């Protein structure tokens, strides 16, 4: 429910690469399924479910422990928000050193180019969100996002932490298969 925005083509690409998709619910389940080799948290509306997500302490702890232990993870948009310290001061997983707050207006919308400052690679994507983030403490963002139609418009966004890559941008895995392979090795 809280995370339901996935490109069907991304899920198909993962399965074609031999990845077994194991569904679970951060709202209903008490912990991550056993034996996972990676975690993919898609977009959605965690702000609508923030109280229930926060109340599921055992799931939040399970995810944080798995990520701190090195489980590879890709979290986009709502999934990234869930991994943050909080959404509108409601406690979330607390793995990513940032806070999220909902705004009354659309913050980003449309096609973008995501430049990964650590690898130097650029990926096409799209953003659509009403949330804003603020890095906490010494944290810094690892991506530069540019509006595809107006490349002079750019902003920081997204980060790597351990084996986790997270950001607002929704990427289409087939546009850059090496990116998908790097994530799930």
Regions found by a protein language model. Give the residues of each.
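Hydrophobic, well-ordered secondary-structure elements that form the walls
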Residues: 39, 76, 93, 128, ...
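Amide-donor transfer/coupling interface in amidating biosynthetic enzymes
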Residues: 100-185
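Cysteine-nucleophile active-site neighborhood
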Residues: 46-116
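Phosphate-binding active sites in nucleotide-utilizing proteins
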Residues: 3-55, 61-66
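Short, glycine-/Ser/Thr-/acidic-enriched flexible segments
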Residues: 1-3, 28-29, 44-47, 80-81, ...
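Structured core elements
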Residues: 22-23, 40, 75, 82, ...
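Generic secondary-structure signature for well-ordered alpha-helical cores
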Residues: 16-22, 68, 98-101, 133
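Short acidic (Asp/Glu) and glycine-rich catalytic loops that position anionic groups and cofactors
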Residues: 39-45, 75, 162-164
């Amino acid at each position: 429910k809280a995370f339901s925005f996935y490109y069907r083509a991304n899920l198909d690409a993962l399965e074609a690469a031999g990845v077994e998709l194991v569904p679970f619910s951060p709202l209903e389940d008490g912990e991550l399924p056993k034996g996972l080799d990676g975690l993919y948290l898609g977009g959605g509306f965690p702000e609508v479910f923030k109280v229930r997500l926060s109340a599921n302490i055992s799931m939040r702890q399970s995810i944080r422990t798995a990520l701190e232990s090195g489980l590879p993870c890709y979290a986009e948009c709502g999934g990234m928000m869930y991994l943050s310290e909080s959404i509108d001061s409601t406690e979330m997983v607390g793995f990513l050193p940032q806070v999220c707050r909902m705004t009354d207006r659309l913050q980003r919308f449309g096609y973008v180019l995501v430049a990964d400052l650590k690898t130097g690679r650029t990926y096409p994507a799209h953003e659509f969100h009403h949330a804003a983030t603020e890095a906490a403490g010494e944290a810094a963002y690892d991506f530069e996002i540019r509006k595809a139609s107006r490349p002079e418009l750019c902003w920081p966004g997204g980060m790597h932490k351990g084996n986790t890559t997270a950001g607002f941008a929704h990427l289409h895995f087939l546009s850059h298969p090496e990116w998908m392979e790097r994530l799930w090795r």
